[in-house]
Every structure is written in C-alpha cells, then in structure tokens.
Amino acid sequence: MPIEDVEKFTYLSKKYCVPIVIYYINNFYFKNFNSTSTITETTYYRLIAPNILRVKNINKCIYFDTDMLCLNDISIFNEFDIRDKIAFVVKDYGFMIKKNENYWKILGLKSNQYFNAGFLIINIEKYIKNNIAEKAIELLKKHSYPHMDQDVLNI
C-alpha cells in the first residue's frame, strides 16, 4: 500500500477518533485466479477477511466495496440480530435484469435469490463454521465464473 494511502487512513482515524487497522494480506491464494482490469486479485480478499478478523475476536463484519458511498451513520447495522444467519445480503435486482433473469439457473442455484457481494454483514463464527471461504476458493480453483467471487458466494 502506498505511503500516501496509509497517511490518509491515519488522518481519517484522527479526525473521526476511530481506530483504523491495516492488514497486509499475502495474495498467494489468489495469484492464479481470474482477474480483469477492474477486478483484481484483491477482490478475493473479502473471502478470507472473516478468518482474519476472527483471530481478533471480532464476531461481525460489515463489508462494503470501495465503490460504495455511505450517506448516513452505518452503526444501525450493529443492531441487526445475525446470530442465526451466515450473512445479511442485498438482492442484486439490477444485475438480474441487465444480465439475464435466469442467470441463477446457469449457476445451479435453487432460486433467483442472487445477491450483490459488494455489501455484506457477516456472522464471522457461522461463516467460518460453514467453511465459506474454503468452499469459495475451491470453486474458483475448479471453474471460471463471469462474476468471480460474487458468483461463488452466491453458490
């Protein structure tokens, strides 16, 4: 990570009086996965983030893609009771309409509940217990998916 980015995070941490921790991830797992000019191997980091955070005794992860804009306080998401769920997700209506309304069948899903992986509230304990990262990585090793990590998380 460029020093300029680290300095920006340091500035934000001080300005808003919140800790910001930077984790440097070895991209060994993702070196041979598909990537494009807009979807790089760093896209796959979301798959292993819960495993990293679990070591820090964190039980919930609110994940936003970097292209998302939050206009209000996100602390409301901490109120969501996620104890019996692996994750809270948002259905990707726009994708299903633009891409193919039957895309879920192509992926072998049982219903059209295809979600956007750009916003996730993850129950870290259940995510790890259900081996989500390992299953997703195995799928990515075996097949090429048009929407890579988002497709395998939906599967």
Name what the model sees in each region.
Residues 1:
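Short beta-strand/loop segment that forms part of the nucleotide-sugar
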Residues 4-56:
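Active-site-proximal specificity loops/subdomain of glycosyltransferases
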Residues 33, 95-110:
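Surface-exposed acidic, glycine/proline-enriched linker/cap segments
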Residues 88, 92-95, 112-155:
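Catalytic core and acceptor-binding pocket of nucleotide-sugar-dependent glycosyltransferases
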